């Protein structure tokens, strides 16, 4: 009887060992996968909090900068600042803390607590050896009418970033593709700010001449991204009451605008712009429509030069739920290092009622026949690009 009990204990012990090994193996296998739309935790087991973000690759490390959200609708405003995570492999992320904090002591600061600080992006300037952050900024209690761009700087990718100023881009400067009618006197009808999407604009943006309206004070800049091409940096943003996309060259130190810019897709209402460049030199933009927090069908466009001309393409999403961009909105296109023409479409699944519960959608991009396609995958990893 004692031998039987001992035998049973030994059997149970080995079953437990096998179960633990199996669980650990399963856990380790899943560590090297992306699960779009599922909770994604950091090295501390806490959900990653970097919404509307972008990624910088520097010194063999990926740095993910994004909006830090808190619980409740108040989380749609900036209560903390910009959060940073770092990774060597894109699957596991280490919490590096808050790298740009909102100002909690000076109500006159443009980044005073409660402002709207969205879509932070960071690029590295090889000449100045500084890390430069740009973001969409709406000072507190202004709603979305200010449409400004904030800029901050740091000596390391880990911060802290020092807020320098906020601006309306390209004040008193016409775009390279300005038309004669833009320079004519602006009617009083256009003096007000139009909010929201195309349903709020009474006429075509060129008939209203919103470009001319904002000539003196600078152009509006809301949803945005940054792109570095051959050491020149560009600020791409929704302008003219969200109706028109601007691609604007930055100064050599990346801290201001050079004055060289063009406007594209007037009255097409492109938000959430993202950009990529293939090894063949082809540029692609993937953006969204303008429907507030509600998801919509993505758009895409291609060009052989970053300043155009740009050719409009179709919705790049080709799997189920393509008409809502898989219930998400674009935020960045990430080039995977070490793999030719490997790009990840980064998007946010917003939750405006409780922003901290927003999820991340990372999906592979396929390049085919001079177009890009974003494919839905419930589970995938970087081996997708090694086929």
What positions do the PLM features span?
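Bacterial Sec-dependent N-terminal signal peptides
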Residues: 1-29
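Carbohydrate-active catalytic/glycan-binding domains of CAZyme proteins
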Residues: 24-387
């Amino acid at each position: 009887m004692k031998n039987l009990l001992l035998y049973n204990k030994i059997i149970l012990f080995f079953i437990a060992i096998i179960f633990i090994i199996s669980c650990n193996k399963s856990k380790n296998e899943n560590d090297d996968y992306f699960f779009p739309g599922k909770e994604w935790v950091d090295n501390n087991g806490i959900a990653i909090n970097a919404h509307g973000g972008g990624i910088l690759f520097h010194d063999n490390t990926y740095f993910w900068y994004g909006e830090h959200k808190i619980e409740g609708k108040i989380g749609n405003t900036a209560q903390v600042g910009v959060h940073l995570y770092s990774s060597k492999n894109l699957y596991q992320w280490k919490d590096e803390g808050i790298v740009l904090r909102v100002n909690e002591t000076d109500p006159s600061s443009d980044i005073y607590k409660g402002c709207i600080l969205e879509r932070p992006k960071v690029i590295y300037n090889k000449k100045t050896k500084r890390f430069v952050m740009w973001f969409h900024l709406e000072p507190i209690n202004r709603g979305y009418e200010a449409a400004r761009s904030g800029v901050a700087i740091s000596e390391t990718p880990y911060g802290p970033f020092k807020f320098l100023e906020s601006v309306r881009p390209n004040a008193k400067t016409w775009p390279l593709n300005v038309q004669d009618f833009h320079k004519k006197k602006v009617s009083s009808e256009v003096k007000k700010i139009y909010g929201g999407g195309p349903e709020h604009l009474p006429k075509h943006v060129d008939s209203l001449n919103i470009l001319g309206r904002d000539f003196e004070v600078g152009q509006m800049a809301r949803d945005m991204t940054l792109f570095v091409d051959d050491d020149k940096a560009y600020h791409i943003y929704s302008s003219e009451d969200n109706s028109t996309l601007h691609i604007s060259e930055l100064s050599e130190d990346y801290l201001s605008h050079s004055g060289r810019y063009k406007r594209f897709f007037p009255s097409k209402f492109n938000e959430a712009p993202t950009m990529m460049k293939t090894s063949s030199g082809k540029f692609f933009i993937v953006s969204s429509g303008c429907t507030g927090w509600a998801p919509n069908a993505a758009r895409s466009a291609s060009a052989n030069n970053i300043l155009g001309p740009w050719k409009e393409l179709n919705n790049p999403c080709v799997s189920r739920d393509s008409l809502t961009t898989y219930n998400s909105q674009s935020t960045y296109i990430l080039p995977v290092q070490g793999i030719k023409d490997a790009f990840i479409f980064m998007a946010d699944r917003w939750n405006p009622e409780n922003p901290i519960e927003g999820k991340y959608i990372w999906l592979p991009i396929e390049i085919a026949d001079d177009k890009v396609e974003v494919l839905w995958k419930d589970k995938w990893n970087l081996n997708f690009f090694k086929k």
